[in-house]
């Protein structure tokens, strides 16, 4: 399959590129050429996506079977690119988000849950949900019968740059006593970035279209499963000290916010980790074991170091007060 990946250097895009190469696909990428050297075996096309004329020049003379787009900012950029790719590509896969569903999310929500409003021509990226919905509409405008909208849940695995698992692995690897947001039996729902990439590529090959909630099956793992497995992966002598949400809130320690288990005001959102993914599973979505996801993330971190921080996804280090955490640990040990 001749594939164009828009981006291709970070997190989801990088996983898509590497998975496609492993499959034997003919892979091109389009990006600014600033973040990382091109992956060996890739044909790099250089352009700033916010400059439609530069994108047009980069695309000129090329055609692809499929395009994968991970853009998360102003929808107008998606619309400009989709317009330029119309007639050059047979399939457009857009990595969207469950965030396009209107808040609050109902328990067990599927693809039919109400959606936020979005404008495909908007230049505003301050509202993530509206931007992603606008991106969806932009793709549908130019690929009405050939658009795959992957509404992803929490994406974990190697190359993660949004301050979840890398932060927890580093935190646990230091040893000692570490606060964890109780209860340990809280369910979590996530997808390994490589499983998402594999599904996107297989779906592109089949010409699958439509909107799909793409995350792991509900009820498969808990927060306790994740953190205890992370401890085992790091091999460190660390003690998890579980603190109830009310206690964390009282001490201004918003642990759990990184997993969407609580909001900045301390409230616990509904519907975050129990989405109905039966449609994607029926279309071939598969998920790997939790231990594999965590172990491979730890190997990547040790090999490449921590990813550069993102302004739109600050590390928990920026909002978790270490002194307040120690005070609560001292309180719980009395």
Please tell me what each predicted stretch does.
Residues 30-35, 48-49:
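N-terminal Rossmann-fold cofactor-binding loop
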Residues 62-119, 136-140:
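NAD(P)-cofactor binding segment of oxidoreductase domains
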Residues 96, 135-159:
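Conserved beta-loop-beta element that borders a ligand/cofactor-binding pocket
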Residues 107-137, 162-166, 189-190, 220:
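Short-chain dehydrogenase/reductase
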Residues 163-168, 181-206, 210-213, 225, ...:
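Substrate-positioning beta->alpha
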Residues 202-268, 275-278, 295-298, 305-334:
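Mid/C-terminal beta-alpha module of Rossmann-like enzyme folds, strongest
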């Amino acid at each position: 399959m001749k594939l164009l990946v828009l981006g291709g250097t970070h997190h989801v895009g990088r996983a898509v590129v590497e998975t496609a190469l492993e499959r034997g696909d003919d892979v091109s990428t389009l990006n600014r050429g600033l973040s990382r050297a091109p992956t060996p075996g890739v044909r790099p096309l250089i352009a700033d996506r916010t400059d439609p004329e530069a994108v047009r020049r980069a695309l000129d003379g090329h055609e692809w079977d499929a395009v994968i787009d991970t853009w998360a900012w102003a929808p107008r950029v998606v619309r400009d690119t989709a317009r330029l790719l119309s007639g050059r590509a047979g399939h457009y896969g857009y990595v969207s988000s469950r965030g396009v569903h209107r808040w609050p999310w109902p328990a067990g929500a599927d693809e039919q849950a109400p959606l936020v409003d979005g404008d495909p021509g908007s230049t505003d990226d301050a509202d993530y949900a509206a931007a992603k919905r606008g991106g969806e509409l932009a793709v549908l405008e130019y690929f009405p019968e050939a658009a795959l909208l992957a509404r992803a849940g929490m994406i974990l695995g190697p190359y993660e740059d949004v301050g979840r698992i890398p932060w927890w692995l580093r935190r646990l690897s230091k040893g000692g006593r570490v606060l964890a947001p109780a209860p340990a039996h809280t369910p979590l729902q996530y997808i390994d970035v490589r499983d998402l990439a594999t599904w996107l590529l297989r779906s592109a090959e089949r010409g699958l279209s439509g909107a799909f909630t793409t995350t792991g099956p509900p009820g498969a793992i808990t927060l306790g499963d994740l953190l205890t497995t992370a401890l085992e992966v790091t091999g460190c002598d660390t003690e998890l000290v579980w603190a109830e949400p009310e206690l964390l809130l009282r001490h201004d320690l918003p642990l759990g916010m990184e997993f969407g288990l609580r909001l900045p005001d301390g409230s616990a959102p509904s519907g975050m980790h129990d989405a109905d993914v039966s449609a994607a599973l029926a279309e071939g979505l598969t998920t790997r074991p939790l231990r594999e996801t965590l172990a491979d993330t730890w190997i990547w971190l040790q090999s490449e170091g921590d990813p550069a921080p993102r302004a739109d996804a600050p590390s928990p280090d920026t909002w978790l007060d270490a002194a307040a955490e120690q005070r609560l640990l001292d309180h719980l040990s009395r």
